[in-house]
Curated annotation (Swiss-Prot):
One Pfam family of this chain: Flu_B_NS1
HAMAP family attached to this UniProt entry: INFV_NS1
Protein name, UniProt field: Non-structural protein 1
Subunit-level organization: Homodimer. Interacts with and inhibits human G1P2 conjugation by UBE1L.
Source superkingdom: Viruses
Gene: NS
Job of this protein: Binds and inhibits the conjugation of the ubiquitin-like G1P2/ISG15 protein to its target proteins. Since G1P2/ISG15 is an early antiviral protein, NS1 may inhibit the host antiviral response. Prevents EIF2AK2/PKR activation, either by binding double strand RNA or by interacting directly with EIF2AK2/PKR. Also binds poly(A) and U6 snRNA.
Gene Ontology process terms (BP): symbiont-mediated suppression of host ISG15-protein conjugation; symbiont-mediated suppression of host PKR/eIFalpha signaling; symbiont-mediated suppression of host type I interferon-mediated signaling pathway
RNA-binding and homodimerization: annotated segments: 1-93
Family in the record: Belongs to the influenza B viruses NS1 family.
Protein species of origin: Influenza B virus (strain B/Singapore/1964)
Record keywords: Host cytoplasm, Host nucleus, Host-virus interaction, Inhibition of host innate immune response by virus, Inhibition of host interferon signaling pathway by virus, Inhibition of host ISG15 by virus, Inhibition of host PKR by virus, Interferon antiviral system evasion, RNA-binding, Viral immunoevasion
Region annotation (G1P2-binding) ranges: 1-103
């Protein structure tokens, strides 16, 4: 990253989560059709079964965060996924699919655009880092944790204990890392917890994560325009603790925005959302 680039914004969307799930459902449909033709070997059959289990779990979790009118079954998503493949393979953006709108940059040398340069859907025009509301929703009794003169092990344990007090639903958690009375990093997290019958809680959706450097300046902001949904239903503590561990180890050196962004996105397998310049750092 260039020296003058000190702030990173990652905008996810539009429709990225649904598009990914639907596309993988289309892949599953292809696997199943190949299996019906008795053309799938044993390793392929194993991949089919694992993909199906993963998708069923992810769809179940994702549907919880969607209004009832937008919830879809695996079979419905398979049909959409197959259409998406046709759009990608045959370069036909006219086959409009809700939640999946390929962005085509026309080649100026050919107005008919037979060969298109396909890229990710661009961020919302005019939405700069400081234009986006920092705390999009009111949260009752937000939790703030100040970790003073603690080693990382004790700090992570305190975060785990505090997060465990959160009620089901949306939450806001502010973590302030204070070492030798020097406020080295602050992390603000917005998300949604689900409470399970066995008493455990899981972080179902991460809406927003901001990281600030020693001077309080915003150095990285993860904006989930189409909420980043945690795929598994493991306890959300693991994600929060891992993020915190990556962000701050008590070093006095400035926090690098690119490193912070990589740390956030790697928790969700979303490193590909970084620009090439950020990824190289």
């Amino acid at each position: 990253m260039a020296d003058n680039m000190t702030t990173t914004q990652i905008e996810v969307g539009p429709g990225a989560t649904n598009a990914t799930i639907n596309f993988e459902a289309g892949i599953l449909e292809c696997y199943e059709r190949l299996s019906w033709q008795r053309a799938l070997d044993y390793p392929g059959q194993d991949r089919l079964n694992r993909l199906k289990r993963k998708l069923e779990s992810r769809i179940k979790t994702h549907n919880k965060s969607e209004p009832e009118s937008k919830r879809m079954s695996l079979e419905e998503r398979k049909a959409i996924g197959v259409k998406m493949m046709k759009v990608l393979l045959f370069m036909n953006p006219s086959a409009g699919i809700e939640g999946f709108e390929p962005y085509c940059m026309k080649n100026s040398s050919n107005s008919n655009c037979p060969n298109c340069n396909w890229t990710d859907y661009p961020p919302t025009p005019g939405k700069c880092l400081d234009d986006i509301e920092e705390e999009p929703e009111n949260v009752d009794d937000p939790t703030e944790i100040v970790l003073r003169d603690m080693n990382n092990k004790d700090a992570r344990q305190k975060i785990k204990e505090e997060v465990n007090t959160q009620k089901e639903g949306k939450f806001r958690l502010t973590i302030k890392r204070d070492i030798r009375n020097v406020l080295s990093l602050r992390v603000l997290v917005n998300g949604t917890f689900l409470k399970h019958p066995n008493g455990y809680k899981s972080l179902s959706t991460l809406h927003r994560l901001n990281a600030y450097d020693q001077s309080g300046r915003l150095v990285a902001k993860l904006v989930a325009t189409d909420d980043l949904t945690v795929e598994d239903e493991e306890d959300g503590h693991r994600i929060l603790n891992s993020l915190f561990e990556r962000f701050n180890e008590g070093h006095s050196k400035p926090i690098r925005a690119a490193e912070t962004a990589v740390g956030v996105l790697s928790q969700f397998g979303q490193e590909h959302r970084l620009s090439p310049e950020e990824g190289d750092n």
